Structures are given as C-alpha cells and as structure tokens.
C-alpha cells in the first residue's frame, strides 16, 4: 500500500511534461505494466538468489570471514529530564542506526515536559478537535512484562499518539493491578522456593507486608518496561487497584450492590484449589482434555497422578444378594455418596425403587432414587452414584431429592473425619487405597480408559475439587441483559465480530459470579458478621447475620437496625474480593468515581478499550455490566480485541517451553547463555529448567539480536490482523530493525543534501516549480496520509503499517531520494531549490506518519530537521499529523511517472537476467505516445536504474545487434548492451 500524510498545498498540474502531450495511460494499463515488470523482476531476483546459493556452496579458498566492526559505545550527555543533546551523526556511535543511542533521553524529557498530559482548550474544557481516552489494562504486579503486554502497549500507544497529533485532548491512563490470586501465588512460590515457608508461617499482616515489598519492586520494574516501550501514559494520573480512591470505589460498589440484593451470601458448590486453598471462578479454571489414561504432575505429590480411567464398582443392595454396578473417575468420592440414581422407566431396576444399598466403608445406608434428568438408561449400567457435595450435576440432584450433602475434604486436600479409615490421607493417595480396599471386599469390577476433561487451576495446575463453601456471589442476570443490549444496539462496538458474537453469547448464558477468595492479599470484603450475645450458634453460611458498610460505623448502624435491642460485636469477613471485581471498575474508578471529579466529567465514558480477546469475559464483560449499573453509562464506546502472541512455531508461550519473550531482551539483545541464566532466577524446578533451556536453544540458537523499541513496536502492530493468534518470529523484528536503519540513513542523506544553511519555506504549499517526480511524491504522500488515517480510525493496523512502510521504503527512499540526486547535483538553481523544499516537506511528513509506531527514531531525526519560520512545535509528539490535501493530488502526473517507474523496473530486470551488475549501457526507443515523456525524464530514468553508465534515446534506425531488448509500455523498446 501507499503511505499517507502531508500538509502542503500544491496547485494541480494537469499538463503533460514537455510539448506534444502524450495520452496518459489508464490506471488499468499502468497496473498491468507494473505487474508485468514486477513479475519479471521477481523472477530474475529468484534466479540471482539461486545462483548466489550455489556459489555459497562452493568451497572457499583461504578467504577470511569478514568481521563486522563493533558499534562504538554511546555515551549520553543529556541531564535526565532535559531535552536531548543531539550529537553529531558522524560520531562513531551514530554513523549507522543504533537503537540504544536513538532511544536514549527522549522519554524522560517527554514526561517531564508534560507532553503526555491531556491538553485542554482556553476555557479549560477538552479541545474542539475531540477527546480520545484509553484506560489501559493494568498489568499484574507479579513479575516482568511479557511480549503480550508489549503488543497491548504498541497498539494502544500508536492510537494515543495518532490522536494526540490530530490535535485532540488525549488521556492515555496507565496503572497496575494488585492481582490478588496471581501475586499471592507467585510470592508463596518464592517463599517456598527460597525458604521452604508458606504464608501460614507468618501472621497475616506480616505476610501482607512481604507482598507489598514484592509489589513495590515489580511495580517499579514494570513501569520502567512500559516506559522503555514508549508508552505515552499520563503518569500524573497513574493508578493502582489498591490505591485509596480505587479501594473506596470497591467498597462503595460492594455495599451498594449488597443493599440492592445483587450481592448475596450462599453455601454452594465452588471450584476449590487445594494448593492455594481458595475458591476460583469458572474463568480461572483451565479445562484440559485427556484422551484416556494419563499421568499428571500435581502440586504436593512426588509421583504423577493417574487420570482418564473409569473405575466400575459394585454396591450391595440391602436385604438381598443383588448388586448395582456404578462407574466413577474419582473413586475417592465414594466416601461422599448419598444416593444411587436410576431411571424411573428402566425395567432393570423397577423392583429396587425405594430400596437402599450399603456403603462399603461408612456405616450408613444409601437410598436408590429415581431421576430421569441425570440418568441415561442407554449409558453404562444405567445406575449413577450421587455425591452432592463434590459434583456440579450431583449437586442439582441433591437439591431435587433433598439428599444429605457430605463434605469429605479438608481445605488442604486431605480426607476429613467423614471418611472413616481413610481420614487424614491425601485425596489422590486415598483414590488408590479405596480401589485396593474394594478389591479386598470383592466389590471392584474393573477399569477402562475414559476420555475426559480435567479442571486445573490456572495458577498452580492443581486439580480442582468441587466443594461446598459459603461464599459471596453476584447475581449477574439483569446486568448481563443490559450489557448484551448495548452491544446489540451498537452503542458499544466490539471488534472483531467474532468477539462481539462471543460477548453476546456469554451474556445470554451468564451464571452467578463467586467473588470471595480465601486469600490475604487484596481488598478485604466490607461485610461483617453480627455475633449476637444471646445466640451462640449462628449460621455463617447464609446472609441473615451479615451486614455491610462503607465504614465500621455504618455497619454498626445497620446491625442495630437489623437486631434492635440486641447486644452484639462485629467481625469483618477475612476473605478478599476476586481481583476482577476491582478491575471491573477500572474505566471509572481511575477517573475519581464515586466522586464527581473533573476527570470523570471530561473523560467518561472513555473512547476505547483495547485488550486481548482472552479476557473478554474476565474483564470486558464485567466492566460493561458494572459500568452500566453503577454510572448509568457505558464505560467505553469501542472495544478492540487483539490476538494472543505465540512463538514462531505457533506454540503458546510458556516458561517451561523456554519461548517466553521479555520485550527488553528484544530491545537490548541478549545472548543464549544469558537467556539460560534468567531461568535460574524464577521458580522453575531443575527438570523444568532443563526443558526450558532446550526450548531456548530451539527458538533462539544465537540468542536475540538487539532490535530496539521501534522495530519491536512496528512488528507487533504489523502482525495485528484481528485474528486469534499472532506468531512472532524474532527474525521479522530484526528485519524491521534494518528498516529503521533505512529510515535513519535516508534522513541523514537528506540532512547532508539540504545543508546547514537550508531554510524551509514558511508553508508547505507547492511553489509551481516542482518537477514530475516531485509532483508524483506529493501525490503518493497524499495517498499515504489518507490510507494511514483511514486505517488507524478503523484500527486496521496491518494496512496502516503497510501504508507507511510502503511509502518510506518503496516511494520515498527507493524512488524520490534516488531520483532527486541528479536534481540536487546537476539541476538548475531553481530545480535544486525546489527539490530541497520537496525533500524537506516530504521527509517532515514521512517522519510524522511513522511516529505513532516508531516514536524514538522519528523524534531523533525530526529534531535534526530545521523548523519552518514561525513554527514553535517543540516535539514531534505534538506535531500535526499529516492529512490528505486536495492540492497534493495529481493523478495525471502520477500516471506519467508510473510509466517512468515501469521502464526502470524493466531495465533492472534485464540487467539481473543478463548478469550486468554495473556500467550498464542502455538505449530506449520510445513509441510516439511516450517519446516526449521518456526523453524529458531520461536523467531520472538513469538515476533510478543505478549502475547505469549511459542512457541514450534512439530512433528506429538503431543497430541493436549487440543488445538484448524488451518491450514496455506497449510500444517502447529497451535495449541493453551485452557484456563483451
């Protein structure tokens, strides 16, 4: 695609160059010729590559390998926070593109100067150009950022910078999430790994202090990474989910929703992680398919645990010799069985309706019940064991038939006092022992492989146990219906459409949300149990004896009203809230809600929420529901869900695979050995470290080269297509680093040609002295500007990056700069001045076009360009973004010049095909239609061909015996003199 962006006015020139105007080619004809020339050039390039490969295979005779000179060390001379002191581009460290040198010092100056803070109009209100607000997804304070965070920042920051350059009032608000479960999990792992201690070895307040210390360390580390990535966050508004105001918002939300009976307390089946000893929401559970008998590594067990096996056992029917055979994948749960269910219409069991079976281990009788919902007569034996306290389906059966709910597990995964001889055993040890005892009793029938789904904790990989626990819940039904409606109506746009459809489907099938967690790190639930002095036995599982309050005093007033005249004490719930509860308030709590602040007035609803599709339900859904419920407004107008980053082979990034990419390693470069060394700092055990090292050797055999921030950002944006996955190949990042070098050197060349005394015109308007190539480059700049703005608005990052890359590489560098060389050296004084002014204008605009994706190199080179008289713009951050200009559009001149490019490409292809690498002798016999054009632009053609010794225009009497020839433009002929 072409690039876009410019700001100048130029009179349209519809006349053809030279006299006797030739008929301009139609776009269709030109495109056909371009395709033909491009195919030919590609074919010859392929041949040349093949030849080079063959040459490379030949043995080298006594040739020493060329060793690249090391880059000189760059020493920054700028005082931190001050405007960068620009060093000479001819100094050793700056002779070629050096990311370290280019990226140094700019960010601190941008922040200190307030360039990232919202700019308001003279009246203190947002500017008339509009408002753009992103409250960026807060990274967890669990460790360093990974490449997925880099993708998020690259996309969001490109949009923030683009909108800022359009003159809008922009707020790009960043912050951090306390991430209760994730952070506590990683801190506990660290304590165990380094000291063999758990949180229970500390008083709660001491453990929380340890987590705060972790938070401070990683908060600072992550903030530095976010800055290194160029994120133009307004750090004066930085937020943390446990800040005072955000904590106030959490309390307000909980109390308000509890008062409306949307939040309630109930004893229900929950997902229990024995490793963390906390409940998890369904979204925090990873359901893993196993094809059959499988061994899984489970926390707390030295040996792998067997899953994917169906065990058949027999229950003896009381008062007879009959047996009922049932099957289970969890034999240990036999100890919690309180019924055996059969289908009421199953003739095999009709005579057993109302009978009992004898429990083999516990001294109790178990009823045989009829249930046509859970039992399928055609499956297995047609009999099903019912364990209401430990299975979601059985839980419903238990409620329907008023069965006893017997819990068999302790919080840490041992069998409890209800399990007789198995009490105190680990649950999976008990699984084996139960089967052994059944064999001894003659009740074991057999086993077979069974494909199944195993629920695992997303943090610990522990196997989840469904258990009965009193918890706090959110009834989401009405909120979800409202959320679905604003998306269906288009009030909130969600892209891509797949994510929109998934959002609506999820909202229409919403379940209640368990929001309490048995953790110590997080927002403690503002609910208080009312201990009544005259009622020693009170039920804590339901909500009757619980009150909530924004303060302890408010809770006391509620307790007095609920229990008038009673003596009581209040005891605050020790549980904390699910992290996503506070995260769901992010778009408005960060702006001051529940207070009515100026930020809330100016910036809410926000403009865009951009994040990975994987947290659509975790986060986006909850922000929409809570935003509508609490503020009466949508939290944002648009949602864009980007892909998940995978490695070059398409694998999920995982520490144990050794393919996790730290963006700083890509920016700075890192050796393979240093990558290995980093593995030793984490919580991986020795086996996992060796596996990860193997993965690193596969993915990064030579380490990761230094690529710089700009190349990384550009790569990530260029790979963003709206798909589900994004495969990142470090070689591609390295390729865009070379593109940065091209941009850097092109600007260096331009600065050299402009000279130190060059003064740009007061405006970017055309002068009327422009040559054909200048008219063409302005036209292409116009197309690039239009394409860039259109695609950024549509968040089509693939096309936006393609547009600016196309313009820089193939139009500005490969064509205009090459073509302008002869104008700058051999043209008349008027031609030289015009070429310089055009070079300046186009380069200035091209740098601005690239700035949203590559902030550092564009600022570095833009600051070296002179400013127009009267232009006081301090930084490219605040420079006007190029927009389409009618006066730069020149279709006729563009078509003429495309004909010139076609001739050039065809000639280059002929040279490649005939092995002519330099001193080419070229003759062109133009047809009548193109004669004036080719003759007048012969110098341009020769300049663009490169390695062309002479170029002559000939007529039909030319003796071509010594030449190869090729027809172009449907009538013109190129002759290339053969090598002797």
From Swiss-Prot:
Alphabetical list of Pfam families matching this protein: Anticodon_1 (PF08264), tRNA-synt_1 (PF00133)
Binding-site list for ATP: 655
Region annotation Disordered: where it falls in the sequence: 1-40
Cleavable signal peptide: none
GO BP term, pick one: valyl-tRNA aminoacylation
Catalytic activity: tRNA(Val) + L-valine + ATP = L-valyl-tRNA(Val) + AMP + diphosphate
UniProt name for this protein: Valine--tRNA ligase
Organism: Schizosaccharomyces pombe (strain 972 / ATCC 24843)
Gene for this chain: vas2
